[in-house]
């Protein structure tokens, strides 16, 4: 039987009395957390990174961040951030500001010296300050430090709920990287545990968990013009209520498609959802597009390949020229050959990332049972 919890933000406040008798003065924790790709897109926020609409994503396997935090109780708090072993001033400032916002959630932060080492398994493109996997791994480390200092081990469900809540405060999409498989963030009818405060894992959903994901790197350097970004943010705010209804409808349709195991309906819905934002941009009076000519070439070739081969291979795309190709694992060899022979000439230096849907974050060098709190989809979907 699935337990039902109603959680509000005060559930994640720190119990200060526990920390004043710390169980240790120093320690180290390491988490590996993967990035996610959206099938139903997150279109904006209100208040403290609460989403205008529910979104649904797939957590990857090979595109991950591994973060280690060495912590020491000190008279004065401080943060040092290293990426690939190199001290990073910009990230140190960014994470220091983020940490300051979390004092009500982790009372111990005001007396800790934190040395953070982060390493990405995937390229960090210009224009991306911090990835969802970086924020997710950082949030998981902080929750583990809380357990070590208080000597109180939280129930698995609460631990990951809080980690997702904390990750959301750093980057909205990071709330979904705390779980594996398919993840929902935002309130959705018929899903009692769904929340704007954190993500929840949906499953088991073999239909989605079997998918391979290939990311075609069309450009590693393009950053949208500020006027275009300002226009998009304004438009997203203006259509927020409409977008909530539309995204909700798309997620419910997607869940029905999964139940029916209709791969081609899945392709149609995912591609339609992916292009909604770009249609709005193309119809705007502000000059600018996210697409490159190579982006359109890949879209055309994927659709042509699907039609000719009968293989349910589709794409999704974010606010960037790069494209994610999704396909069932049983067609892996055929699709990989198609990518190498047909799509790679459209990629920058023929770069692409080969990935698949993953199990979610793991703690490194410690015995830890990953969260098995899955939301079981009922027959009424």
For every predicted segment, state its role:
Residues 2-48, 58, 62, 72, ...:
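C-terminal nucleotide
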Residues 8-16, 23, 108-208:
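Gly/Ser-rich oxyanion-binding loop with an adjacent helix/lid
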Residues 56-110:
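Glycine-rich, flexible beta-strand/loop modules in the N-terminal catalytic cores of phosphate-handling
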Residues 57, 89, 93, 128-136, ...:
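Short, conserved micro-motifs enriched in small and acidic residues
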Residues 82, 117-127, 320-328:
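Short glycine-rich or small-residue beta-strand-to-loop segments that form or flank ligand, phosphate
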Residues 90-123, 142, 294-298:
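Helix-rich "cap/lid" substructures immediately adjacent to catalytic or cofactor-binding pockets
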Residues 103-109, 146-154, 304-312, 342-347:
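Alpha-helix termini
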């Amino acid at each position: 039987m699935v337990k039902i919890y109603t959680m509000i933000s005060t559930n994640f406040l720190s119990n200060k009395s526990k920390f004043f008798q710390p169980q240790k003065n120093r320690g180290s924790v390491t988490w590996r957390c993967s990035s996610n790709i959206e099938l139903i897109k997150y279109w904006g926020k209100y208040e403290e990174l609460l989403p205008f609409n529910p979104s649904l994503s797939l957590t990857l396997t090979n595109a991950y961040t591994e973060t280690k935090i060495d912590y020491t109780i000190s008279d004065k708090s401080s943060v040092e951030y290293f990426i690939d072993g190199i001290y990073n001033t910009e990230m140190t400032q960014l994470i220091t500001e983020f940490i300051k916002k979390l004092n009500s959630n982790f009372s111990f932060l005001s007396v800790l010296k934190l040395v953070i080492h982060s390493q990405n398994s995937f390229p960090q493109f210009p224009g991306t300050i911090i990835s969802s996997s970086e924020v997710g791994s950082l949030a998981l480390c902080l929750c583990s430090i809380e357990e070590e200092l208080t000597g109180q081990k939280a129930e698995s469900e609460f631990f990951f709920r809080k980690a997702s809540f904390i990750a959301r405060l750093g980057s909205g999409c990071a709330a979904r990287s705390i779980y594996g498989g398919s993840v929902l963030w935002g309130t959705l009818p018929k899903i009692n545990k769904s929340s704007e405060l954190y993500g929840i894992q949906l499953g088991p959903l073999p239909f989605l968990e079997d998918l391979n994901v290939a990311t075609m790197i069309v450009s590693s350097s393009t950053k949208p013009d500020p006027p275009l970004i300002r226009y998009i943010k304004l438009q997203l705010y203006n259509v927020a209520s409409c977008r909530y209804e539309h995204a909700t409808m798309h997620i419910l349709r997607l869940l029905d498609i999964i139940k029916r195991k209709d791969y081609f309906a899945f392709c149609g819905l995912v591609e339609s959802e992916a292009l909604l934002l770009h249609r709005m941009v193309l119809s705007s009076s502000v000059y600018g597009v996210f697409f490159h000519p190579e982006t359109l070439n890949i879209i055309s070739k994927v659709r042509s390949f699907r039609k000719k081969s009968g293989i349910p291979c589709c794409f999704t795309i974010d606010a960037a020229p790069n494209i994610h190709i999704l396909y069932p694992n049983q067609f892996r060899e055929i699709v990989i050959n198609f990518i190498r022979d047909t799509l790679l000439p459209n990629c920058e230096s023929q770069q692409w990332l080969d990935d698949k849907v993953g199990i979610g974050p793991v703690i490194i060098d410690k015995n830890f049972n990953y969260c098995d709190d899955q939301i079981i989809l009922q027959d009424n979907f």
